[in-house]
């Protein structure tokens, strides 16, 4: 068998064994995709024992390409929500996520200096303790660029593997300890969250308002500023028994009923000016109007603003809501359309059909992947990651590397959505498949390279000490941030658990947090809020630590 065929066969064996190990669960908790690392260690151990030689260049390429695929698809997935998560609504949660990364870095620095742990080893332990595989890849690359001996760099995978199991279990232990220490009642926390979230959430709401202000009588809709703002959409107007879609030139009369869509505070502002909220149905049932949901798939409208489509004037159709990546937005005139946007339309059936044809509404396109944008994005990411940044006093130029470059580019492209006919939308199933393939390839190679000396290091070397260091890097930040969040800001426990899981970019921990109260979405919401920023910081933090430690 050729060296290439043997290498591919061994990687397949590692993947099968590792994924099987990852499916093992103890009290509902398993290693998940991390099992591939241990599958690689087992196969790597026997490969060295029986002197099976694999193609080193091929392994190196597969490791780096797997990492690129993983971080790029992560960036595309979280890109649309990354920048919005930094706004006020998620600012507090993200501040705690930043604090956790900072505390973890400080603990790592103290252990490195106090116990004289070699830099590659402590960075490997750090990556495993926070269960973040891209951080391991980023640390390996920056240390290689800095000139660290290849033998030490190859040991990073062992440090990662030693710390990884407690990284998975440690966060669950911390959640349990916080619950025990503060004597938390889960049902009470869930009810408190539902009550608070129902009052404060920024989801869109509707309001039916009767026109009572005599100053508005005789004015057209376009002459009332609040009805033309980017915060509220007036989707229906009822006059007597007639229900219509209001045009910009439609004249308002006393006694008209307006159906408004927007966030609660914006709706209240309109109500104060227009009249009073009324309990009158403005349903399209039994009328000439109907509602429909259509999806944007036509390349010709990508990037265009809603006002440029002129749907009200041409077709007497109004867009009431815009759903992007699961987030409902006000369909303001200044909103630009992106591939995959879901639009709520109100109008006559024939007009809605015409508008559907304009925006595309081709459901099958949502299942197709444009490969050209994928490779453009990967190429740009690699180029960005290779650009050197020379800092006076540093022994090597700083780079985002093959982990940071594709991630930054993917975040930006995911946020932009499309450029011309190129769109970076990726169906969730395709994104997940590429992401899982990438991380399996990366972990397989890391495990194979680490397996030869793993048992010897654990039994006769410093393996047990590394496990202890990893436990400190896992536990201290989690306990610190968890206790502070609960004591200082009285954070809801379910929200707290989701925030901790998101800050560790740890899906098994999210599954555990969701299981605390299956009907509450508190944990999932806070996890999604902090995950994008946490993933970015987790990938960048070992590179920053590597450069700082290298110069000291």
UniProtKB/Swiss-Prot annotation:
Protein known as: Putative transport protein YPO4083/y4100/YP_3992
HAMAP family documented for this protein: YidE
Membrane in keyword set: yes
UniProt membrane topology term: Multi-pass membrane protein
Keyword Repeat appears in the UniProt entry: yes
Organism encoding this protein: Yersinia pestis
Gene Ontology MF term list: monoatomic cation transmembrane transporter activity
Pfam families membership: Asp-Al_Ex, TrkA_C
Record-annotated membrane-spanning stretches: 1-21, 26-46, 65-85, 96-116, 119-139, 158-178, 371-391, 393-413, 439-459, 464-484, 493-513, 530-550
Signal peptide (from-to): none
InterPro entries (UniProt xref): AAE_transporter, RCK_C, RCK_C_sf, Transpt_YidE_put, YidE_YbjL
Family: Belongs to the AAE transporter (TC 2.A.81) family. YidE subfamily.
PANTHER family in the record: K(+)_H(+) ANTIPORTER SUBUNIT KHTT (PTHR30445), TRANSPORT PROTEIN YIDE-RELATED (PTHR30445:SF3)
